[in-house]
Amino acid sequence: MNERQILALLKTGQVVFHYPLKVHFREGGGDFGFSVPKRNFKRAVRRNLLKRRVREAYRLNAGRLNGRSYDIFIYYIGKEVEDYERIDKSVAQVLDDLAAR
């Protein structure tokens, strides 16, 4: 996703919260993006760890959308580093919510 697509998604998309994630989405092309804010995690090592965990959780759970395509932007809102199981559970819940719509 490029900056223009992200801004359009933030303006026109819907939002779902499942701690520690805030997910903006809309039906569309099937693009995926995510962000871990620098203001919450100063060290790049921590941000990269969380980005790897979110990316892997999405990759493993993407099949829950049942072939429907959404533009999805995941924003990590937690203040602490959560373990992979917590992130995976949150991503699975979000994708189940989207599939049910």
Regions found by a protein language model. Give the residues of each.
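Positively charged, solvent-exposed patches that mediate nucleic-acid binding
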Residues: 1-101
